[in-house]
Amino acid sequence: YYKTIARINELEPTFEKMTDEQLKAKTEEFQRRLQGGENVFDIQVEAFATVREASKRVLGMRHFDVQLIGGIALHQGRIAEMKTGEGKTLVATLPSYLNALTGRGVHVVTVNDYLASRDAEWMGKIYRFLGLTVGCIQNHMDDRERKEAYACDITYGTNNEFGFDYLRDNMKYDVESLVQRGHYYAIVDEVDSILIDEARTPLIISGPSEEATDKYYIANDIIPKLQRGHKDEETKVTTGDYIVDEKNHSAVLTEQGIAKVEKLLGISNLYDPANMEILHCVEQALKAHTLYKRDHHYVVQDGQVIIVDDFTGRLMHGRRWSDGLHQAIEAKEGVKIERENQTLATITLQNYFRLYEKLAGMTGTAETEAEEFATVYNLDVIVIPTHKPMIRKDYPDVIYRTLEEKWDAVVKEIQEKYEKGQPILVGTVSVENSELISERLKKLGIPHNVLNAKYHAREAEIVAQAGRKGAVTIATNMAGRGTDILLGGNPEFLAREFLKRKEINPDEATPEQYEEALREAKAIVEKEHEEVVALGGLHILGTERHESRRIDNQLRGRAGRQGDPGSSRFIISLEDDLMRIFAGDKLRSMMKWLGMEKGVAIESKTVSKQIERAQKAVEARNFEARKYVLKYDDVMNKQRETIYGLRRRLLFEKDHREYLVGEHGVARDLLHDLTEMYLNPKVPRYNWDVDTYAAEIESIYGVDPAVDAGVDFKTMSPAEIEERIWQKAYANYEEKEKIIGAETLRAYERFIMLNIIDAQWKDHLLSIDHLRQGIGLVGYGQKDPLVEFKKQSFDMFQEMLDRIDINTVKALFNLQVVVRDEQEEIERIERLKRQKARRGAAAYTSAYEGVAAAGEESKKHTPFVRKQPKIKPNDPCFCGSGKKYKKCHGAES
C-alpha cells in the first residue's frame, strides 16, 4: 500500500500544474488506454492522482494518505474499516472513478435515500468535473428515470432499491423496459448494516394470495386459554401448555398443550397433514402473544401493525413479517387482518450482492464480524489507520440493579454535563426509551433534541449540531448515521439556519448572502470549538448494551473523530433485556458476592467482560441464524439463476423457433418422452397405453393421431408413430406461421413462454414456502432437514420445468388463428354505414367501438367449426397459468 501511495504523491506536483482542461482530458486518455488493452490496475496510480487533484479544485478537499489506503483496499474488493469522521464518502470517489472508466457502471450503496442523494450531489461534482455521469435511484422514481440513472457511469442508491430493481427486471416482458444493465462493481457504505444486520430479511415482491384469514382469529382465541410453563434444566421435566425461550426467540407447545389445543379445536391429531395449516397458525399466534411486544417490536397506528426496526428504532412502513406472523399479530391486536401475501419474486441480500463481479465495503466497525464477511462474501477486512491518533476516553460500564436506578443515574449524568456546557449524545435502543428520558429532562427544564429516527434529512441537521456547547441530543443508536458531529457545530448547517431566520430560502440565496451567513457561522463555530475542546469534547452516554458489540462501537465512534477529544460511558441495569436474558444468573450472583446495595452502582472490568461474553454469544447465535437462512436460499439461488437465465435468454434472443420446434427443440423432445412413456418398445404392444397417449397428443399438440396423422397403432413402430405425429403437428405450426407472419408468431412465442414461466415460478415459490415450513418435522425421523429440503426442492423444480415445457407446447400448438376474408370485411363496413345513417354520428361511434372490441358480431353468417373441445369453466386455463379457466382468461372474457 505505502509504495502505491508514494507513487501517487510523487505525481501530485505534476498534476497541480495542469490546467482544468488538461486534468479533464485524463478521463478520455484512461478510457483509450483501457480499450487498448491496459487494465484498471495499470492506470490506478494516475487515476487516483487525478481524482485527488479534481477534489482539491472542486470541493477544496484533499485525500489524506490514509484515505488513499482506503481507496486501494476498496478497489481490490475488500472492506475498509475506517473510524467515524475519517472521510469514507470521499474515499469512495477514488475506486468509483477508476472502475467507472470501464464503462460498465459502478453502484454505490447507502443505507437511506437521503444519504444517496446527498452523496450523489456532493461527490458528483468531482465526477462531473472529470466528464463522468452520475445517477441516483430514489424510492419515488418511475422506470424511465431509473433506467437513466443506471445508464450513468456511477449510480447511488439504497440496497433495497438495487435489489428490488433486480427482481422487477426479472418480471419484465421486453428488453426496453429493463432498468439495470449488469452487476460489475459495488461499493457498500455502512457495509455491516447492509450485509449483516439486514441479511436475515429477504427482499420479497408479493401479491395477495387467495387464502382465507379467519383461521388466524381461531388460533388467536386459543392462546389466552393456555398456561405458560417452564422446563427444569436438571430433570428435563416440563410444566404448563407451552414453553417460551427468550434466548432463542422461540415458543413451543408441550405435550399437555398439544392435547389442550386439539380439544379446543375439536380435532384428534394436530400433526395430521390435513391440519398443518391450523397448526402453523397456532404456532404463529403463540409467538405473537409471547415474543412480540407492542411499542417495542411493533406499533399500532391507524388500524395497522407497523414493524419497528431493531437496529434503528425506525418505523418500517410497508414492511410485513412473513410466514403468517404479521397476520397473527394483527389478530392479537384486533385490527383488520390483511391477506397473506404470495411471493412472486424473492432474493436475500447476501445472494443479491454475490451477483457483482467485484464487491467492496466501508464501515467504522467491521472487525467484530470479519469471520462472517470472509465466510459468506469472501471479503477481507482491512483496518485503515486514523489520520490523527484517537484520544477518546472509553470509561468502564456502570451497572445498577434496577431500571429505575439506571434512569435516575442517566438523567443525573446528563444534568452534570449540561451544567458544565459539555455536549452530550445519549444513545437509546428504542423510541420508547428516548421519550422516557425526554420527559424527565423536560421536568428539569433542560433543553434537548430528540431524534426519533423518522426523517433522515432533519436527522442530519440535528446530528450536525450535536457538538455545540451545551447541546443535549437523545437518539436511537443508529439515527443520523453518515453525518459527522463537529465540535462547536457545523458551519454550513448553521449558515442555512441563519438564512432561514432572515426568511431567506437557503437554496435560493445569492452567493453574497450565503457567504455572509457562512462567515458569521464560522466565527461562532470556531469560538465554540475551542470551548468544547477545553471541556473534554463530545460525551457519549449509552443507556443499554445492544445485542451486537458493533452497534455499541458505532455509538462510541460518534465521539473522538479526527483526533478530537471525547469520552464515552454505558450506564446499564440488570433488568435490561440483554442482561436479563443472556447474562442474568451469573451477574446476579456476582453482584450478591460484591455486596451490591440499592442505588449503588458498580464499575467492574470483570462485569464488563461478562457482558461482552454475553454479546459474543448472541452474535454467534445471530450468525448461525443468517447462515441457516443463506443455506436454504442457496438451494433456491441455483433455481432462481436457472429461471432468470431462461427469462433473459427469451428477452434478448429474438428468434426462439429452433429452441421450440427445432429438431432437438422442446416440442420434439416432449413428444419423444411421451412416446417412450406410453408406447415403450421394450414392452409387448398389447401393454401400450394407447388411449392415454392419443388423448395426451390431442390435448398438447392439437393432433388426433389416428384421424389427423394416419397413425396405425397395430402395425407401426413407436418411432414411426412419433415421426407421423410430428410431421402433422409441425405442418400445422408452419401453416399458422404463414397466416400470421413469422415476426408476429415469434413475439407471441416469447410472450406465452414468459407468461408460463412466471406463473409456474410463482406457484413453485409458494410450494417451497410450504415445504420450508414443514421440513423441520423430518428431524424427528433422524433426517437432516437441509438435506431433505435440497432433495425435495430439486424434485419440485424438475417437475416445474416439465410443466413449463408441456404448457408452452400446449399453448403454441393449440393456437387458434382466425382470419376474416375480404368479402366479410366489406359487408361489415356496409353494415356499419347503415347503422350510422339510422342512429346518427354519436351512436355510430359507440357501435363501431363495440363491434371492433367484440370482433365476433360480424361473423354470424359464417358457421364456426371448433377444432378443439370447448373449454369448460373448471378446466385448466389454456395460457398455462395453472388457474381454472373461469378465474383466468374466462373471467376476462
Predicted features by range, described:
Residues V175, F864-V865:
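Short, P/G- and charge-enriched loop/turn segments at secondary-structure junctions
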Residues Y298-I306, T312-R319, Q562-G563, F570, ...:
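Extended, charged helical/alpha-beta scaffold domains that provide interaction surfaces
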